[in-house]
């Protein structure tokens, strides 16, 4: 995803006030407070560019057809042909004379086409865009004032979701066949809207400012055609992710309410009467002659509308002005907060609202890239099982470079650890590694290990290659134990790893005894094995062991690694 993405906003469809975005209604800061704006001047097009931009091909086609009909009528009146006739009045003699080729009524055919095309031509002149643009004539000063209001206006990015379904209905219609009327039943489907939801983009945390250009040079042209477009962009990835996250959350909440959902979105400027097209004149009371309505209709009646439009396009300057709002300037990642930390207003807010986590708003493309490269994301449970912790154990000071986990009671996770003085290792990375939670639910795995099983060979097998981590102790009276018998990676043969879950009775039935036990000294290592959950990591060097057996409430489940 490209960091500053931009999207054009629609001007129709209604604003979304139902979302309760909490965006302040005050106007934005003026242009003088921010950095210097880039200037934009109207463009004076050439003749070829004016034709390419707006060719008025409908008017041109109708004009050419009418000129062709007029040419046909003129040809009928000017051209003469020699005719030879035989009549009995002249006693069988032939008569030669010169006459028009359309004397037998053929002249009415081009006249009929001419009248029909002329009517269509006048309708096209009435509905053409050039005539509508002449109705929005404004002076240069009012244009500058309107541009200033749009720059200071508060933007509102809205979303609208319409849930609907189709209902099958019938109605009686009358049809005619061979002059006979008969009634039949017609089946049709009618759309029924069941739910309409609206929301706005809450940009209170990321901030917004106007980055539109300064429009200058309107006084230099006799007429300037202006087109205004609303758009918005993002200055940081966090702001864009906040927008995408809110947008996706809104449409996800309204997606399953009915069979179908119509999604609409756009942006409007609050308290601003937005107009897309305008024509600015230095003096609107005395516009150029080609920009007058009287000249336009006079040329239309004389079938000269297309030449007048081309002349007006050539003599009129053109400017496409973008009202652009930039989001993402007041967040923690902006330039204002890089050097000075958080502002006093930011310190009053909850810490989770300071920054939107990247992993919570990552899109599908970037998520796939993170999964492939295994970077910047917390590894999954299966990935943790395959991690090599030998290097981690050497950094944490294990004996012989091996990884020695420690339980929360202070005992060392190895055979003969009951005599070791209870203490916590100061290595933060080691503590963080051994305090991972189990992926299985404790309600689903309410099977405890018996004391006899804890004293078996599985609990005392202290292979150097055995790797496990201790999860935190839960408050329930039942706990789960993962016991493993695995050989070292350096050995010639690695025995089969058997992972079992055995049930254990409740440690204490009296809550007072539990409180006294927790307040007392740490229990021995063999007793401590019954409390935490041991997540046994399968050896990477063991070949041929691709399945493990899970005994859950007496049933065996084979899971493939």
Curated annotation (Swiss-Prot):
Disulphides: none
Spans traversing the lipid bilayer: 59-79, 106-126
Chief subcellular location: membrane
Keywords assigned: Membrane, Transmembrane, Transmembrane helix
Xref: InterPro entries: Tmem151
Listed Low complexity bias regions: 1-10
Comp. bias (Polar residues): 489-507
Gly residues bias (residue ranges): 11-22
Keyword Transmembrane helix tagged: yes
Topological type in the membrane: Multi-pass membrane protein
Disordered: annotated segments: 1-42, 489-523
Subcellular locations according to the entry: Membrane
Residues in coiled coil: none
Cellular component GO terms, alphabetical: membrane
Bias (Acidic residues): 510-519
Matching Pfam families: TMEM151
Similarity remark: Belongs to the TMEM151 family.
Official protein name in the record: Transmembrane protein 151B
């Amino acid at each position: 995803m490209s960091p500053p993405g931009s999207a054009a906003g629609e001007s129709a469809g209604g604003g979304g006030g139902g979302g309760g975005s909490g965006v302040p209604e005050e106007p934005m800061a003026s242009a003088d407070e921010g950095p210097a704006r880039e200037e934009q001047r109207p463009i004076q097009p050439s003749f070829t560019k004016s034709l390419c931009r707006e060719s008025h091909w409908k008017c041109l086609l109708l004009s050419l057809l009418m000129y062709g009909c007029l040419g046909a009528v003129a040809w009928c009146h000017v051209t003469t042909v020699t005719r030879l006739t035989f009549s009995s009045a002249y006693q069988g003699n032939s008569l030669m004379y010169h006459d028009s080729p359309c004397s037998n009524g053929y002249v009415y055919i081009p006249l009929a086409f001419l009248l029909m095309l002329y009517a269509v031509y006048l309708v096209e002149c009435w509905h053409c865009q050039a005539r509508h643009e002449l109705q929005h004539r404004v002076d240069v000063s009012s244009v500058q004032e309107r541009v200033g209001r749009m720059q200071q206006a508060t933007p509102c990015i809205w979303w609208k979701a319409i849930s609907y379904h189709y209902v099958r209905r019938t109605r009686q219609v009358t049809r005619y066949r061979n002059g006979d009327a008969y009634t039949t039943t017609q089946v049709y489907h009618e759309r029924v809207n069941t739910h309409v939801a609206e929301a706005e983009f809450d940009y209170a945390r990321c901030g917004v400012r106007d980055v539109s250009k300064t429009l200058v040079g309107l006084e230099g042209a006799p007429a300037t055609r202006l087109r205004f477009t609303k758009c918005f962009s993002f200055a940081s990835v966090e702001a864009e992710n906040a927008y995408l996250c809110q947008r996706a959350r809104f449409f996800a909440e309204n997606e399953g309410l009915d069979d179908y959902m119509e999604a609409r979105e756009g942006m409007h400027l609050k308290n601003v009467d937005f107009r897309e097209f305008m024509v600015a004149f230095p003096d609107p009371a005395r516009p150029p002659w080609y920009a007058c309505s009287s000249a336009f209709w006079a040329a239309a009646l004389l079938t000269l509308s297309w030449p007048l439009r081309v002349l007006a396009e050539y003599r009129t300057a053109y400017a496409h002005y973008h009202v652009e709002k930039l989001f993402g300037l007041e967040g923690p990642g902006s330039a204002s907060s890089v050097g000075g930390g958080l502002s006093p207003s930011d310190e009053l807010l909850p810490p989770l609202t300071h920054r939107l986590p990247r992993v919570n708003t990552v899109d599908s493309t970037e998520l796939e890239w993170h999964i492939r490269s295994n970077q910047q994301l917390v590894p999954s449970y299966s990935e943790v099982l395959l991690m090599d912790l030998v290097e981690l154990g050497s950094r944490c000071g294990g004996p012989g470079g091996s990884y020695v986990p420690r339980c929360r009671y202070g005992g060392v996770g190895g055979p003969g650890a009951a005599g070791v003085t209870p203490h916590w290792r100061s290595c933060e990375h080691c503590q963080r590694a051994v305090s991972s939670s189990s992926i299985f639910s404790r309600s689903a795995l309410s099977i405890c290990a018996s004391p006899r099983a804890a004293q078996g060979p599985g609990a005392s097998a202290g292979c150097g290659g055995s790797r496990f981590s201790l999860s935190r102790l839960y408050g329930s009276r039942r706990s789960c134990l993962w016991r493993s018998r695995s050989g070292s990676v350096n050995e010639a043969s690695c025995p089969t790893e058997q992972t079992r879950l055995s049930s254990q009775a409740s440690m204490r039935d009296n809550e007072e005894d539990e409180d006294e036990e927790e307040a007392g000294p740490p229990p021995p290592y063999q007793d401590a094995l019954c409390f935490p959950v041991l997540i046994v990591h399968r050896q990477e060097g063991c070949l041929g062991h691709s399945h493990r057996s899970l005994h859950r409430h007496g049933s065996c489940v084979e899971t493939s690694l």
